[in-house]
A protein has these predicted regions:
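General small-molecule cofactor/ligand-binding pocket signal
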Residues: 8-9, 53-58, 106-109
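Glycine/small-residue-rich hydrophobic helix-like segments
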Residues: 40-90
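Structural signature of eukaryotic scaffold interfaces centered on beta-propeller domains
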Residues: 14-27, 64-76, 119-121
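TerminUS-proximal long segments
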Residues: 99-130
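Short internal beta-strands
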Residues: 30-35, 82-86
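Single conserved hydrophobic/aromatic residue that forms the stacking wall/gate
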Residues: 1-7, 11-12
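A conserved acidic, glycine/proline-rich C-terminal tail/linker
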Residues: 82-108
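Histidine-centered active-site/metal-ligand motif
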Residues: 1, 17, 124
Length: 130
């Protein structure tokens, strides 16, 4: 497993893919603190909220790939958040409002094959193109 190092100790509990636990955008970060070792949660929270609005993701949302989003920018400079429909449906209404406050829009598509057989979601798929 890969994770952040604090001293010489990993701060992320076992997870098959660390890129599903969080995404970081220009102004917002979506993160699942449940999978971060308890003694490091406050440190990570303070670090990310210094420059970003924080959307806390639950463990079930993590399994629905809510942390596997990607911020993209169009040629007019507008920011969008790309995710799977599975992730979109897993966000709460208040979380969607937080997202829409920070982005021009949300782009989501159904990605069942990527999510079931690829082990990732929208960000994993799109990051292969960069």
């Amino acid at each position: 497993i890969n994770g952040c190092l604090v001293g010489s100790e990993m701060c992320i509990r076992d997870s098959y893919h660390t890129d599903v636990l969080m995404y970081i955008g220009t102004n917002v970060v979506g993160i699942c603190f449940d999978v971060i070792k308890e003694k490091y949660r406050e440190l990570v929270l303070e670090s990310v909220k210094e420059h970003h609005e924080v959307i806390e993701l639950s463990s079930p949302q993590l399994l629905d790939f809510c942390g596997n989003c990607l911020e993209v920018e169009n040629n007019c400079g507008d920011l969008f958040l790309v995710m799977s429909t599975r992730a979109y449906k897993s966000y709460t209404g208040s979380q969607i409002q937080q997202i829409k406050k920070n982005y021009k829009g949300v782009i989501h598509r159904d990605l069942p094959v990527i999510e079931r057989y690829g082990g990732g979601s929208a960000r994993c798929m799109l990051a292969e193109l960069f």
